[in-house]
Amino acid sequence: MKVQPSVKQICDKCKVIRRNGRVMVICENPRHKQRQG
């Protein structure tokens, strides 16, 4: 899980979602998981 000021989709499988008011990227590839904060 990377915590970054701006989250971006890295590949085609990445999805940007909102969870508990946080913007997150979820993906099949665990290296692509990101959270904004």
Curated annotation (Swiss-Prot):
Q: Does the keyword Cell cycle apply?
A: no
Keyword annotations: Ribonucleoprotein, Ribosomal protein
Query: One MF term in GO for this entry?
Result: structural constituent of ribosome
Keyword Ribosomal protein recorded: yes
Q: Give the UniProt record's GO annotations in the biological process aspect.
A: translation
Output a single Gene Ontology CC term carried by this record.
ribosome
**UniProt xrefs under SUPFAM superfamilies:** Ribosomal protein L36
The domain of life for this entry's organism is Bacteria
Q: Which NCBIfam families match?
A: rpmJ_bact
Concerning HAMAP family, the annotation shows: Ribosomal_bL36
For this chain, the family text in UniProt reads: Belongs to the bacterial ribosomal protein bL36 family.
Query: Which protein are we looking at?
Result: Large ribosomal subunit protein bL36A
Gene source species: Kocuria rhizophila (strain ATCC 9341 / DSM 348 / NBRC 103217 / DC2201)
Query: What is the name of the gene encoding this protein?
Result: rpmJ1
